[in-house]
Amino acid sequence: NASTMLNQSKNVYQAEIDSACELIDFFNFNCQYMQEIYQQQPPYSPKGMWNMVQYRPLEGFVFAVTPFNFTSIAGNLPTAPALMGNVVLWKPASSSVYSGYYLMQMFKEAGLPDGVINFLPGSGGQVGNPVLDSEHLAGIHFTGSTAVFQGMWEKIGGNIAKYKTYPRIVGETGGKDFII
């Protein structure tokens, strides 16, 4: 919570909700969703056959790009694909490296093996361009601006022929809706 307060100028109540409470909720929900996915099997197998679904990680890595203003989302975007067996390259927003760094230390202390989530702070171009150019890009997990996400889509579209698989792309952008 303290790193969120310092890094994102949140008060103690905002930081508690943002970094600790909601991240714990994400972890609980993600574990439940993972169990539900793995339990989904075809309801019928003909005699002498066994119909089954096998889930496996993507072939390559997932690029998690996290926002500047929400520590729990910054913790969720790299951990959700890692929980499903994927290797993740995590690029935090340049202005949220401090809280992201402490999340990464927490993951390591909890036993996350080296190389599962790889913390890559840096500018969007320095980190993003080589990642999006890699033939091993298998997925994007993004929260941030619409313009950045559109730029990523454009670059992926231009690179589509060189990727080993079609990248799966998940993004949340421009959450500026009003509430009445």
PLM regions with names:
Residues I24, Q32-I180:
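Rossmann-like NAD(P) dinucleotide-binding subdomain of oxidoreductase/dehydrogenase enzymes
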Residues N1-Y38:
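Glycine-rich loop-to-alpha-helix module at the N-terminal edge of alpha/beta enzyme cores
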